[in-house]
């Protein structure tokens, strides 16, 4: 009995040490592996497995997901690819897959989503070139051309985050090499300028009666009746 108790004590001590060495769920351990919660269910065929005595997130092939030199989730790496969170689920058929050892957001075809730079990078990328004439490659970063997500560009178009899902049939599409929010018809949503064009979310003109005065609603109808009576 004493031998059994001693073995149990040693095993408990080893388990305690192993647990202490494990990173908290949601963090990366000293080897850059993503620590998961075994009680959670993860998307994209990923699972929480015990590896080296710690619960680690593994991909569909059972390999641990490494952070290594990957960009932080929500940022772009040095190749302009969007870094994602392997524990999150993404819209529009997008998914978070391990590419070259890093969790990257890929489209429905499994190709990494690349931030547009104004030039085509060839096969295997999802960069979209503009229908306008080709421009020389910029030596600056791609972010210098596109407005930050949540801001408007110089043309008043809303810059969006390709990893987000937007309501009312709106989608985030790459137009003129920048991610822009589009309405259900695929047209960019433009910030209202008061020009009264009535397109792309701009306000329409109010009815004009008489010498340029602006009347709306019932007042416009009354004014029209008065003019007709005269």
Swiss-Prot record:
It is found in: Vacuole. Disruption phenotype: Affects proper autophagosome formation, asexual and blastospore development, and virulence. Leads to severe defects in secretion of cuticle-degrading Pr1 proteases and melanisation of infected insects. Reduces the transcript levels of all autophagy-related (ATG) genes including ATG1, ATG5 and ATG8, except unaffected ATG26. Keywords: Signal, Vacuole. The keyword Signal applies. GO terms for cellular component: vacuole. It comes from the Eukaryota. Residues 1-19 form the signal peptide. Vacuolar protein required for aerial conidiation and conidial maturation. Also involved in blastospore production and cell cycle. Plays a vital role in the secretion of Pr1 proteases for cuticular penetration and hence contributes significantly to host infection and virulence. This is Vacuole-localized protein 4. The gene is VLP4.
